[in-house]
Every structure is written in structure tokens, then in C-alpha cells.
Amino acid sequence: MQDDLKNAPIGFFDSGLGGLSVLRKALEMMPNENYIYYGDSKHAPYGEKTPQEIRSLSFNAIEFLIKKGAKAIVIACNTATSAAAHDLREYYKDIPIIGIEPALKPAIKLHETGSVIVMATKATLNQEKFKNLMDKYGEHREVIPLPCPGLVEFIEAGDLEGEDVKNFLREKLNPYMDREISSIVLGCTHYPFVKDVIQDIVGEKVDIIDGSSGTVRELKRRLEENNMESESKKKGNLDIFNSLEDKKILELSKKLIEIK
């Protein structure tokens, strides 16, 4: 039974395609594990929904992954983590559930001076969880919350470097370019897919950080703690599902995760 558990897949869930940026890091750091990814593109973006709606959709997604035999769950969505992680952990006590939050701590530690911009959805920035982070790390440094409604939709449509998304990001970031910005935190798992465009706008001196590595390290720790890590020496399997039953979205998912 324990061997079956070790070989069971790890479930990843996001409001759409964004969580693939976290899954990509997991495939790099733990290639021998099996994975299931569920993207809820039918209901994306979550950032404009109420906390109650986000919780309901998150429970549906977790149920899907558990029915597929997931041994652990990664909520690869900042918005869903903020709104639903606590309730999900209370309900599913027997399964490790790992969330993701804006990587504000490492961003602050990287530099002694300069402001930090946190790009995220409105829902993430409005949640108590983010306000607590602001209270903790924003005491001695300027932290600028930057809601980006509309950016997720570009990425869900596969527009990662077109003129429209470039103009959108310029409009968002240009007002801050006369300040000393040390770091930008990507507080939504969709945003790493446009990291290069953001870097071009802000310049190479600004560090751009996301929470993927920290989340995968925590996943690894929890699996080891529960004796659930795969002992296979082979590369694991990956199955991708999406609530939007559209061939194009699955093709885009594979492209984003660089599956040949």
C-alpha cells in the first residue's frame, strides 16, 4: 500500500494555465514523480471573483485531483491559496496541501534599498494573507501592490509577447520607472510566462522573483516528512486536464510546459 502511495501522482491545480509555471519547476526539481495538472480555464480568471466563488471552484478542482488518485496537492494559484487554502486543509486533513504566496520575503532580502513592486490579482492583494505580508515586510521598505486585471486573459489566450501584452505591461509599469525599484514580485503564477517582457520594460538591474522554487521545496519537504516521495529512478508521467474542453488549450498547456 505504501509503495502505491509513493507512486501515486502529485496533483497541481490552478485557475487556468498559470500553475504550469510551478509545475515546470517541480518537473525540474523532482523529475521522477508522477504529476496530474488541472487547469480551470473555463472559470479563469479567479482574480475578479468573490472569495466564496474561489473557494467553491477550488474544492471542485481538489475533488477532481483526489478522484484521480493524487497523493498530495499543490494549489499553484496565488488567488486560490489566499482565499481557499485554510478551508481546504481543514477539510482534507489526510492529504498534504501546499499553497503559494507572493515571494515578498526573498525580494526584500535581496537588496538593502529600493522599492518592491508586487504584481498580482485584485483578489490576492485584497486578502488578509497579503495584508499580513505587507505588515511584516513593508515596515522598512516601500512595497507597491500593483493589481493587473486583464493580464491573465492575455496569457490564457497564448499572447506572451505580442504588442498588445507589451503595451498593457508598459502602461502598468511605466508610472513607477522614475523610482528606485529593486525587485518585482510576480504574485500570480500566470505572470512568469511574460517575465521576459517585464524584464525588457524595467531593465536588467531589477530582479524579478516568483514563488515557484519555494513552493516546490516545501512540496518536497512534505513528501519526505510523510514518507511519500517516489523511489523510481525513471522520469515520471504527466497528465494534463482542463475544465475548458478545448484541444487548443491542451496544446497551449504542453507548449507552456515545453513538452515536445
Curated annotation (Swiss-Prot):
Pathway participation? Cell wall biogenesis; peptidoglycan biosynthesis
Residues annotated for substrate binding in this entry: D14, S15, Y46, G47, N78, T79, T189, H190
Q: What residues form the catalytic site here?
A: C77 (proton donor/acceptor), C188 (proton donor/acceptor)
Might you give the EC number(s) for this enzyme? Answer: 5.1.1.3
Gene3D superfamilies hit by this protein: 3.40.50.1860
Among the GO biological process terms of this entry, one is: cell wall organization
- Pfam families per UniProt: Asp_Glu_race
Q: Which reaction does it catalyse?
A: L-glutamate = D-glutamate
Output the superkingdom of the source species: Bacteria
List all membrane-crossing ranges: none
**Known InterPro entries for this protein?**
Asp/Glu/hydantoin_racemase, Asp/Glu_race, Asp/Glu_racemase_AS_1, Asp/Glu_racemase_AS_2, Glu_race
Q: Which UniProt keywords apply?
A: Cell shape, Cell wall biogenesis/degradation, Isomerase, Peptidoglycan synthesis
The Gene Ontology terms for molecular function here are: glutamate racemase activity
The EC category is isomerase
> Per the similarity annotation, which family is this?
Belongs to the aspartate/glutamate racemases family.
Question: What's this chain's function?
Answer: Provides the (R)-glutamate required for cell wall biosynthesis.
The protein's name: Glutamate racemase
| Upper lineage | Bacteria, Bacillati, Bacillota, Clostridia, Eubacteriales
